[in-house]
Amino acid sequence: MANLIPWFTRRNFMTGSAALAGSLAVQAQEHPTASLGAGESFSEYQERRRRELWGLLGDLPWNHKAAPPQRVRTEKHDGYTLERWVLDLNGVEPVPALLLIPDHRQNPTPGLLFIHWHAGQYDLGKEELLLGTSVQPPYAPVCAKKGLVTLAIDSWCFGERKHDANGHRGEEDTFKEMLWRGRVLFGMMMLDEFRALDFLAGRPEVDPSRLGAFGMSMGATKAWWLAALDPRVRLTIDVCCLTDFESLIEAHGLSGHGIFYYVPSLLKHFDTAQINALIVPRAHLSVNGRKDPLTPPAGVEKIREQLLPLYRTYGREKDCLIELFDCAHEELPEMRKQILEWTDRYLVAG
């Protein structure tokens, strides 16, 4: 048990969970912010670290009083109704959104936050839910068939929030201006997703105890960050964007990510596994490509080796699956099979 939680300071601690009742010896790592406090339970540790993680995301407009959401129009599709909304999530600019409501669904039914990718496709944004990409078929028909009320928003600089004809320049300018003003682009992105989850959870069709976050690439990163920051996320599914930050540096992979990915001072306080430990013991499926430069295999395996013992301690090892497939930055049919199985098990089945 000595190496059970390899990034914590060696202490004995008690947890309120029956699965973790008793004391666990834990091992030291260099940075003191990774340590449990004396007498601190794991859930208390998570809450403290969650606050620290939010604190790294810049000056966020927590006191903003949102205007009521505005439904723009409704469209009928095969198997679902699509509502187009404009949401006030941040007080800086309106956020266009898609809300997919299946014709056949439970009452109440699970909710899914679909988070779009980057890939330099600044025009695509939330429409990825409907259109898919060259490496991932669309999810709208799947969500309709599964009975998932699904929300997708345009991220900063994407879709209807692309304000510069040159999308790359627009993203860099937004990042730099926010930095000057004490804000962090990724922090504002995560605030939008957090507030979007508020909207989804508050829908009358949705069971707020069955919420999932899903995405590929940038969407994957935002999905596991959101789950770490917000315990309401019951199921996290990330596709092709989970690896240890230091492994990414060692593999010279930093240029593969947009500038949004980089949070000032993050590595002084957290590594990837420490962020993902804030999801434990909630369900987490991560599928990645062994040939993907964004997910160096050694970094994926490192996270798996650190997270699985935590899930095992809760008796929930089956609720965490971190996989490597023989592919690059793409979703394989075998990946989608796992994604649908996990969606059925943790959202649809309740």
Task: Please annotate each region the language model reported.
Residues 115-191, 247-250:
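Cap/lid segment of the alpha/beta-hydrolase catalytic domain
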Residues 179-180, 195, 235-276, 281, ...:
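Mobile cap/lid helix-loop segments that gate and shape the active-site cleft of serine hydrolases
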Residues 2-7, 12-30:
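N-terminal export signals
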Residues 215-219, 223:
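Gly/Ala-rich beta-loop-alpha elbow adjacent to hydrolase catalytic centers
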Residues 305, 310-350:
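C-terminal catalytic histidine-bearing segment of alpha/beta-hydrolase fold enzymes
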Residues 172-216:
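Gly/Ser-rich "nucleophile elbow"/oxyanion-hole loop immediately N-terminal to the catalytic nucleophile
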Residues 65-105:
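N-terminal cap/lid segment of alpha/beta-hydrolase-fold proteins
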Residues 286-288:
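Short beta-strand/loop motif that positions the catalytic acidic residue
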